[in-house]
Structure formats: C-alpha cells, structure tokens
C-alpha cells in the first residue's frame, strides 16, 4: 500500500517478489513453512484463518532460535546478521540481533508476535481468535502434520513430535525457545 503511488517503489517491490520467487524455486523451505501450512486453516472454525505470510513472519524468529542449536545453521544466521550490519561480538549475540530485527520488522508491519494475539485480518489483538483451549486441543495433530509436511525434510534441525509441539506452543504464547 505504501508503494501504490510510487512508481519506483512499485518497481522495487516487483523486483523483490521476482527475486524471492527465484530463490524459493532454487532452495528448499524448512519448518517455518511447515508450521505455517498446518496452522493456516486449522482454526477456521474459530472465526478465521492465519494468513500464510503472517504465520511465516510470526514463526521465523522462533524457528531461527530453534535451528541455531545446529552449528551450521547458527553460522549462517550469524553471517546474515553480519551482512545486515546488526552488530554483535559473538555468534549468539548476532543471532539474537537478527531475531530482534525480525521482531521489530513484524512490529513495523503490524504483524502479531504470536498466535494468541492474532486477531481479525491478521492484526495484533489483546485476545486473538484462537482460544487457548482450541489451540491445545489441536496441538498434537498440527505438530504431527507439520512434521510430515514436505518442507520439514530440508530444515537444518529435524524436530521430534515433542519439539514441534513445544515450538508451536512458543509460537502461541510468544515464549522463549530454549530447547
């Protein structure tokens, strides 16, 4: 919307979409997409669905923290943080700075940090449309389906059923990933 009356902005947005599409075509996706695929329509009976792009944005910081336990992934995340000039003296600091930048980007784009606060139209809300009771009732199946999703196989760290449930729970409450 910010680019609607800005030809250069529209051109840049189109180019960005094009490059992203090429990257997706040449790289495999991971559990961020697996989780987004399986939560997207899981709560339709609660009055809406979680928009795929918003789900990816909400889950990415949590998944980075989860994947950073894998040394190769951690080095790659630190490289991205360095490339973006985010600062940090250690690999962990760089990863934390990358996560903080993504969370700020979500704030700037008015994307909630967690499912619990995912409101109508994807906007942050004090109480989102997915109740805690409904989330807990569907958690096991969502996690199992996410593990079976085609994107999971290319994730740098393969989650167990228990880890996927924990990760989704962190994404529901916006709690720290420490496993």
Where are these regions (language model features)?
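Glycine-rich phosphate/pyrophosphate-binding beta-alpha loops
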Residues: 18-56, 149-154
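Short alpha-helical scaffolding segments that buttress acidic/His motifs in well-ordered protein cores
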Residues: 13-21, 35, 60, 102, ...
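Residue-level detector of well-ordered alpha-helical segments, enriched
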Residues: 9-12, 31, 35, 55-59, ...
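Short, structured helix-loop boundary elements
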Residues: 10, 92-95, 136, 161
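Short, amphipathic C-terminal "tail helix"
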Residues: 133-179
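Gly/Pro-rich interdomain helix-loop hinge
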Residues: 42-134, 177
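Carboxylate- and glycine-rich phosphate/diphosphate-binding segment that chelates Mg2+/Mn2+
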Residues: 1-27, 124-126, 162
